């Protein structure tokens, strides 16, 4: 998965801040855009609102990228349809077809898991997981919210 360009991150952040009525906030430097976007999406959820679609998509992708960066490998595929999927976690890798370890969940559940707002056990009924390695509880939340490689 290619790294998101700052322009895409900034556009998603701006759109979410406008939806939150915080359009006049000073934009963060490029190095902080990802964290600012995650915070804006969480603020929407905290306010009882749905994040704007672009911000939701980009945030899900940012958090999946962090998981894959911190726990590289190809033994587990994590899917957040329709937004993104990554392969991560060292171990036996697959080369064709569906991987033996697949985790799939919706974007809100993924964001809440990745940021430590909910635990794997609390979200179990909203996660489809198959395979002996399809449990990310020891790897969540992602940095800077918790788990470190």
Model regions and ranges:
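Short coil/turn segments at secondary-structure boundaries
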Residues: 51-55, 66, 97-101
């Amino acid at each position: 998965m290619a790294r998101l360009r700052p322009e895409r991150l900034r556009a998603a952040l701006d759109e979410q801040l406008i939806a939150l009525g915080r359009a006049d906030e000073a934009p963060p430097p490029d190095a902080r855009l990802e964290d600012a976007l995650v915070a804006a999406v969480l603020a929407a959820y905290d306010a009882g609102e749905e994040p704007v679609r672009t911000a939701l998509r980009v945030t899900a992708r940012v958090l999946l990228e962090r998981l894959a960066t911190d726990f590289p490998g190809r033994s587990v595929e994590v899917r957040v349809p329709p937004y993104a999927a990554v392969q991560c976690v060292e171990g036996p890798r697959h080369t064709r077809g569906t991987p033996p370890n697949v985790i799939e969940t919706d974007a809100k559940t993924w964001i809440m898991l990745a940021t430590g707002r909910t635990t794997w056990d609390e979200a179990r009924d909203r996660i489809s997981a198959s395979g002996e390695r399809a449990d990310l509880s020891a790897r969540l939340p992602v940095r800077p919210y918790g788990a470190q490689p």
